[in-house]
Design a protein with these regions (language model features):
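Cys-dependent condensing catalytic cores that perform Claisen condensation/acyl-transfer
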Residues: 1-167
């Protein structure tokens, strides 16, 4: 089957994001990826951390629930203060970058990122925010979900996606 694979997904510098190492180990890898990619986004767009700090920027993320490893579940039981739920994906970004707009995670299955973009556009048009960070994340730790989707004919025959394609 076809999949977009990420190398070194566990390589994360928690100290840069002011996250204790033990807390980072307990966090959903999607949260760590979203933090890293948000930093990349601002950097590639030419914004410094000082320029975006305190800005009226909303964070709108599409996300699917993440499988919890046994290690993360045990750590969360010992340290319930660690923000590990899917709803914290946007909050972590807003907090680290000191963004003052709304932060939300949307789960509408395959349309989560698109729905997030629609919400962000509406907030921009209404003047609720001045800028928006919009994205989507769905990390699958193994191939079981993909195989289930294949068995139920939820994927294309090529086992890859063809968004907005005539196929």
């Amino acid at each position: 089957f076809y999949a977009g694979l990420l190398d070194e997904i566990t390589h994360f510098d928690p100290s840069f994001f002011l996250i204790p190492k033990e807390a980072a180990r307990a966090m959903d890898p999607q949260a760590l990826l979203v933090l890293e990619e948000s930093l990349n986004l601002f950097s590639h767009a030419g914004y410094s951390l000082q320029e975006i700090k305190g800005s009226s920027t909303g964070v709108y993320l599409g996300a699917r629930s993440q499988h919890q490893s046994e290690e993360r579940v045990l750590h969360q039981a010992r340290n319930p203060i660690v923000a590990v739920g899917q709803n914290y994906l946007a909050s972590n970004v807003s907090q680290f970058f000191d963004l003052k707009g709304p932060g939300m995670v949307v789960d509408t299955a395959c349309s989560s990122a698109l729905t997030s973009m629609n919400l962000a556009i509406n907030a921009l048009v209404s003047g609720e925010i001045d800028s928006a960070l919009v994205g989507g994340v769905c990390l699958l730790p193994d191939d079981s979900t993909h195989r289930l989707f294949q068995q139920r004919n939820l994927l294309s025959k090529e086992s890859s996606f063809h968004i907005f394609d005539q196929r």
